[in-house]
């Protein structure tokens, strides 16, 4: 229903317009207060790169963060990552991730980024506190913040927006009548716009999510996902249909697709109940970091990597590395 409202297919979005106007008024006032100097943002002693969205829902932001961290690491840059830690609840903040940190403490995306990149990762509701925790423990040269485009309390040097190239901005309205956190005109002020799928427009960087080999959660064995049989697909991400479409494109045709809420807590019994005798469970890598501790032999995940095309990605990386002292 939400997808139909935000796309404009359902006329119910009109009923929510008063709330959207209020949301837009408040969010605009907050941003203006920082632009006018009425509120002060905290500036880190190292450059800060924000990777965020203009819309709610999954746009492929986390794969972009991983891509950016890995590309900078390949250039010899010491990178730290901060996040709000949605879906997690730590005993105390800021929380600096370790190999023992769980998704229940830090959230699924920070744990995934930490496991994939090995970069220092810290979470806190106040992102400045997370930055300070990393700087106190690690000699990093740059900070990447996973989400937080609208978190103006943290000053930033570069802003990158990730856009779903198929859904784009839906009906164009602020939450809750539409998907927008800020209006599309905000794109004029960011340093780069990366478009996940669909067709990129002038000045935007095209990106595709390229699936790798399926990985068994228990053994680490790898195989082409199309070789798996009797698949039940599970996706607890911002836009589950994208994952299900990826499986179809890979030649894996799920018998059943189970969409879950983004950052949803997964109980062992609930996940186990999804799979019947002789079936194979295939999930996203983000779900896998929550399920690995209680995984069964027939559970697999499909990792995806961000592939950015054209000359713009190299120019963006050069611009970012030029800020590193």
Curated annotation (Swiss-Prot):
This is Tetraacyldisaccharide 4'-kinase. The lineage of its organism: Bacteria, Pseudomonadati, Pseudomonadota, Gammaproteobacteria, Enterobacterales. Pathway: Glycolipid biosynthesis; lipid IV(A) biosynthesis; lipid IV(A) from (3R)-3-hydroxytetradecanoyl-[acyl-carrier-protein] and UDP-N-acetyl-alpha-D-glucosamine: step 6/6. Transfers the gamma-phosphate of ATP to the 4'-position of a tetraacyldisaccharide 1-phosphate intermediate (termed DS-1-P) to form tetraacyldisaccharide 1,4'-bis-phosphate (lipid IVA). Its EC number is 2.7.1.130. It comes from Salmonella agona (strain SL483). Belongs to the LpxK family. GO terms for cellular component: plasma membrane. Keywords: ATP-binding, Kinase, Lipid A biosynthesis, Lipid biosynthesis, Lipid metabolism, Nucleotide-binding, Transferase. ATP binds at residues 55-62.
């Amino acid at each position: 229903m939400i997808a139909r409202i935000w796309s404009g297919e359902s006329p119910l979005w009109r009923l929510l317009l008063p709330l959207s106007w209020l949301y837009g008024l408040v969010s605009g006032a907050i941003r203006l207060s920082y632009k006018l100097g009425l509120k002060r943002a905290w500036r880190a002693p190292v450059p800060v790169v924000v990777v965020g969205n203009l819309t709610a829902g999954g746009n492929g932001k986390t794969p972009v963060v991983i891509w950016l961290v890995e590309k900078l690491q390949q250039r010899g840059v010491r990178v730290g990552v901060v996040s709000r830690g949605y879906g997690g609840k730590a005993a105390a903040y800021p929380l600096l991730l370790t190999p023992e940190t769980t998704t229940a403490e830090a959230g699924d995306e920070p744990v995934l980024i930490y496991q994939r990149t090995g970069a220092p990762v810290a979470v806190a509701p106040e992102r400045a506190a997370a930055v300070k925790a990393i700087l106190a423990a690690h000699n990093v040269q740059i900070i990447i913040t996973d989400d937080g485009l609208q978190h103006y309390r943290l000053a930033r040097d570069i802003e990158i927006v990730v856009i779903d190239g198929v859904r784009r901005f839906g009906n164009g309205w602020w939450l809750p009548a539409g998907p927008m956190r800020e209006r599309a005109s905000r794109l004029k002020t960011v340093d780069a716009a990366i478009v996940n799928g669909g067709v990129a427009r002038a000045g935007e960087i095209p990106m595709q999510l390229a699936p790798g080999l399926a990985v068994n959660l228990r053994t680490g064995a790898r195989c082409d996902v199309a070789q798996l049989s009797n698949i039940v697909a599970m996706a607890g991400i911002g836009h589950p249909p994208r994952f299900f479409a990826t499986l179809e494109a890979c030649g894996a045709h799920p018998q059943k697709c189970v969409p879950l809420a983004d950052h949803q807590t997964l109980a062992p019994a609930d996940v186990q109940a999804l799979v019947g005798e002789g079936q194979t469970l295939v999930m996203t890598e983000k779900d896998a970091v929550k399920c690995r501790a209680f995984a069964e032999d027939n559970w697999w995940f499909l990792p995806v990597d961000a592939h950015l095309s054209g000359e713009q990605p190299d120019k963006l990386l050069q611009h970012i590395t030029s800020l590193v002292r």
